[in-house]
Structures are given as C-alpha cells and as structure tokens.
Amino acid sequence: MNGLSFIDDEQIRFPSPELALSEPNGLLAIGGSLHPKRLLAAYYDGIFPWFNAEDPILWWSPDPRAVFLPGELKISRSLKKSLKKHPWRVTINHAFADVMAGCAQPRKKQRDTWITQEIQLAYLEMHSQGHAHSVEVWMKDRLVGGLYGLAIGKVFCGESMFHRETDASKLAMMALHQHLLQHDFKLLDAQIMNPHLESLGAREVSRTAFLSLLKRYRDEPVAKSCWLPREMPIGK
C-alpha cells in the first residue's frame, strides 16, 4: 500500500521508491536531514530531496522519470552558432560553490528558490567528499553558466543548471554529456521532465525502468581521474 513515510534524524534507509504517492507524483517521505550518508542512500535508491524553504524536507521518486541516454543529447543550431561566435571556456569542478549560487538565483516570475542555504551547505559537503560535481561555462574570466549534480557509479544525477548568457547552460549540458560518454557513463538522471529538457533530448521512462537501470550501473567503478578539476574540450 502506497503512503507517505515519516523519517527521523537517525534513520538513513528509505522505504521502497515504488511506495511513493501518485499525487503529488513521487512524494515518498518527509523529514530527516541532509546528512551526506542520507543523501547518498537516497540517490543510490533513486530518491532526491526537493522542498521549499518553509517546508520540511521532502523526498521524491516520481513516475515517470526524465533521463538522458548516451548519445541522445540534441545540440541546437543556436548552440552550434554560439560555439563559433563566442570565446567560451568550460571547466569541471573549478567553482562548485559559485555554480550552486548561480542555480539558486530565483528564475523569472519566481519569488524564491528551492536551492536553500541548507541545500547549498549539504551539497558543498558532498562536493568536498567527492560525490557532487559541477561544470562551469566561462566567457573570459566571468562565470556565465553551469550545472551541478551527483555521480553514483556510472549514473550522473543532474540537479540544476543556470545561465547568464544565452546558450551557456546548453553548453554546460553538452560538455557534461561528452564527458560522461568518454567515461562510459550509462545514464544521466534529469528527474522531472520540462520543455527545456525535452528540447535537449531527454526522454521519460517509467520509475520501474529507471530503477532497473540505476541498480544495474550504480556500483560500476569509475576512474579516479574522471572528476579531477580540469578544462574541458568543447566539441564543435
């Protein structure tokens, strides 16, 4: 029987994602904290936190799930033109905190953000432990876009992206996609579909299918060099 579970500060493991509510879609549990062990346990099981500043911590595993499969990213004509026109530079793990701060800025027509100070501190700790990673897009020395997420084996769980220049977030996604292909990643989790993700080539799969892929690849080893800070080549 599906139902909302309440977790306390000591509880690390989560109920099965298949028990998540259908309305609101994917809500599985409430409570707990954003301790690194709990966050790792959540992503390992296909669960992620998503809540507003005034809410308790809410944990989700929606059905269907938005994902990118290897080789399915769509590169728009505008991005191809931008690659030729602008002196972009892309790095990995050079400015994680700045990328999170950029993602935390409220979007147009939004009063606030779900990327609260609590979220930022939790993922900064995950970054310091080597679990969370960022891609940065620069125009000369100015950060103009980027994204961040977590790596669980050969699955990358994307969290958020931002841009201050047209196409900068698309370039961050393209660079990440190329990087994941080079290191034989099998899945890029995008969580919940939206028009922007769909335009980039994301597809929806059932929660059951997503969890099957996650279980297959979450324990696959990745070279330590994969996430070393570096400048990333830009495929044109």
Swiss-Prot record:
- State any GO CC term: cytoplasm
* Annotated InterPro entries: Acyl_CoA_acyltransferase (IPR016181), Leu/Phe-tRNA_Trfase (IPR004616), Leu/Phe-tRNA_Trfase_C (IPR042203), Leu/Phe-tRNA_Trfase_N (IPR042221)
- Top-rank taxon: Bacteria
Its GO biological process annotations read:
protein catabolic process
Record-listed E.C. numbers? 2.3.2.6
Query: Is the Chaperone keyword given for this protein?
Result: no
Keyword terms = Acyltransferase, Cytoplasm, Transferase
Gene3D superfamilies in alphabetical order: Leucyl/phenylalanyl-tRNA-protein transferase, C-terminal domain (3.40.630.70), Leucyl/phenylalanyl-tRNA-protein transferase, N-terminal domain (3.30.70.3550)
Cite a single GO MF annotation.
Answer: leucyl-tRNA--protein transferase activity
UniProt keyword annotation of Transport present:
no
Give start-end of the signal peptide. Answer: none
Q: Where in the cell is it found?
A: Cytoplasm
State the reactions this protein catalyses. N-terminal L-lysyl-[protein] + L-leucyl-tRNA(Leu) = N-terminal L-leucyl-L-lysyl-[protein] + tRNA(Leu) + H(+); N-terminal L-arginyl-[protein] + L-leucyl-tRNA(Leu) = N-terminal L-leucyl-L-arginyl-[protein] + tRNA(Leu) + H(+); L-phenylalanyl-tRNA(Phe) + an N-terminal L-alpha-aminoacyl-[protein] = an N-terminal L-phenylalanyl-L-alpha-aminoacyl-[protein] + tRNA(Phe)
**Family stated for the protein in its record:** Belongs to the L/F-transferase family.
Q: What does this chain do?
A: Functions in the N-end rule pathway of protein degradation where it conjugates Leu, Phe and, less efficiently, Met from aminoacyl-tRNAs to the N-termini of proteins containing an N-terminal arginine or lysine.
HAMAP family listed in its UniProt record:
Leu_Phe_trans
Question: What PANTHER family does the record point to?
Answer: LEUCYL/PHENYLALANYL-TRNA--PROTEIN TRANSFERASE, LEUCYL_PHENYLALANYL-TRNA--PROTEIN TRANSFERASE
What protein name applies here?
Answer: Leucyl/phenylalanyl-tRNA--protein transferase
Q: Which organism is it from?
A: Shewanella amazonensis (strain ATCC BAA-1098 / SB2B)
UniProt lineage: Bacteria, Pseudomonadati, Pseudomonadota, Gammaproteobacteria, Alteromonadales
Name the gene that codes for it: aat
